[in-house]
Amino acid sequence: MRNNCNNNQYDYENYDNCRNKREQTHVHEFEGSTMFAEECEDRHNHRFAGVTGEAIRRGNSHVHKLATNTDFVDHYHQICDTTGPAIDVGNGKHVHLVKGYTTCRDGHRHQYIFATLIEAPTVNENDYDC
């Protein structure tokens, strides 16, 4: 139930900032809802959405880091995690599984499990003839 939030999650020094011409790698959108927490009148869950960081090579696949806040229902939680490796969905596309726990707020935390959205699901390099 450890949460991976920390101040050093992203390596901002290596991001393209006009002086650094490093080629960027792909990202994924994500959205989901946490599992319910607490009981009776306090029982609730939260929604979240965001965009992952760039691909990070891991073995013969890759992963992505992500960080976002949930919506506010008297309080909010943070989600900071690393995806699992790429899962092929055909046609050269893939998704990633993410499973973990939010930060603890208001005396509780929420479990989440979701898959990222397909990277560039509608983009085809021939779609934009200039």
Regions found by a protein language model. Give the residues of each.
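Peripheral, non-catalytic segments of secretory and membrane proteins
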Residues: 1-130
